[in-house]
Amino acid sequence: MVKVANRPGVLSRITGLFTRRGYNIESLVTGMTQDPSIYHITVAVIATDDEVELLARQLERCMEVICVKCDGGEDWEFVQKEMLLIRIPCDSPEKRVEIMNICALLSCKTAGVGKNSVIVEVSGDTSVITAALRSFEIFGDIEVIHSGTVGIDMY
């Protein structure tokens, strides 16, 4: 997680740092904090702990970076969530009831109901997302839009 000054080009410089070092960004989510001059960036990469530490040190050298916090520290607690929107084909009332029952079981929300489909919203950690995908795959040709991971530390 990185907090940066809200200025033009900052996100490009941050992502460029990862690209120049050969890391593929798995997930990138940005958003304004309660202070409009500061942006929060959550970046997920596949890397060793040592590589993450190196990337954090590189990020800290960037002028616009206010602070960097990395997953992996023993005494660092944080909450992270992902979100899915799933369009599920639904051509009968029975199938719609089955979808609603799965939603209730997984604590999903119905985001929209159309003539031939149901849109389901799922949010949670990776295990919740995986369980929802497996549960709704039985309905055939689902369409999935997956957000990146957002996170915040406990302190």
Predicted features by range, described:
Residues M1-Y39, A44-Y155:
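Long, contiguous binding/interaction regions
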